[in-house]
């Protein structure tokens, strides 16, 4: 069994690949796949967004190369940004 951090890294990888490749490239998330991932894995994040275009905005911000898909590196940027925001929130409110 690995450390907590190794387990967390494995989970990030597994979550990405559980949702990627259903439509085309197995190493990227389409907009539909990204929406499914967000709804399944980050439903609290989506629920907090009152914007019906939240997924479109997230996709636009993440898709750095403009190919209309989110690769693993772009996905990790989302996870890192949300982790920083959560860390800041919890430290400020503790």
Swiss-Prot record:
UniProt PTM comment:
Glutathionylated; glutathionylation increases affinity to calcium about 10-fold.
The residues that the entry says bind Ca(2+) 1 are: 28, 33
Q: Nuclease: present as a keyword of the record?
A: no
List of residues that carry S-nitrosocysteine: 86
Question: Sorted alphabetically, which InterPro entries does this protein's record hold?
Answer: EF-hand-dom_pair (IPR011992), EF_Hand_1_Ca_BS (IPR018247), EF_hand_dom (IPR002048), S100-A1 (IPR028486), S100/CaBP7/8-like_CS (IPR001751), S100_Ca-bd_sub (IPR013787)
Report the domain of life of the source organism. Answer: Eukaryota
Residue span, EF-hand domain: 13-48, 50-85
The Gene Ontology terms for molecular function here are: ATPase binding; calcium ion binding; calcium-dependent protein binding; identical protein binding; protein homodimerization activity; S100 protein binding
The processes (GO biological process) annotated in the record are: intracellular signal transduction; negative regulation of transcription by RNA polymerase II; positive regulation of sprouting angiogenesis; regulation of heart contraction; substantia nigra development; vasodilation
Q: Where is this protein found?
A: Cytoplasm; Sarcoplasmic reticulum; Mitochondrion
| The entry's keywords | Calcium, Cytoplasm, Glutathionylation, Metal-binding, Mitochondrion, Repeat, S-nitrosylation, Sarcoplasmic reticulum
Q: What PROSITE patterns is this protein classified in?
A: EF_HAND_1 (PS00018), EF_HAND_2 (PS50222), S100_CABP (PS00303)
Pfam families documented for this protein: EF-hand_1, S_100
Task: Say if the entry is tagged with keyword 4Fe-4S.
Answer: no
Q: Which annotated residues bind Ca(2+) 2?
A: 63, 65, 67, 69, 74
Tissue specificity comment = Highly prevalent in heart. Also found in lesser quantities in skeletal muscle and brain.
SMART domains listed in its UniProt record = EFh, S_100
Instruction: Provide the assembly information.
Output: Dimer of either two alpha chains, or two beta chains, or one alpha and one beta chain. Also forms heterodimers with S100P. Interacts with AGER. Interacts with CAPZA1. Interacts with FKBP4. Interacts with RYR1 and RYR2. Interacts with CACYBP in a calcium-dependent manner. Interacts with PPP5C (via TPR repeats); the interaction is calcium-dependent and modulates PPP5C activity. Interacts with ATP2A2 and PLN in a Ca(2+)-dependent manner. Interacts with mitochondrial F1-ATPase subunits ATP5F1A and ATP5F1B; these interactions increase F1-ATPase activity.
Q: Give the note.
A: Able to bind zinc in vitro; the binding sites are different from the calcium binding sites. The physiological relevance of zinc binding is unclear. Physiological concentrations of potassium antagonize the binding of both divalent cations, especially affecting the high-affinity calcium-binding sites.
Protein name (Swiss-Prot/TrEMBL): Protein S100-A1
Species for this entry? Homo sapiens
What gene name is given for the protein in this entry? S100A1
């Amino acid at each position: 069994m690995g450390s907590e951090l190794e387990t967390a890294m494995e989970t990030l990888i597994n979550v990405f690949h559980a949702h990627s490749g259903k439509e085309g490239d197995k190493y990227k998330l389409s907009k539909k796949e990204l929406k499914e991932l967000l709804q399944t894995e980050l439903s609290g994040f989506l629920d907090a967004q009152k914007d019906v275009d939240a997924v479109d905005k997230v996709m636009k911000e993440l898709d750095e190369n403009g190919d209309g898909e989110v690769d693993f590196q772009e996905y990790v940027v989302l996870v890192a940004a949300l982790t920083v925001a959560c860390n800041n929130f919890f430290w400020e409110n503790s």
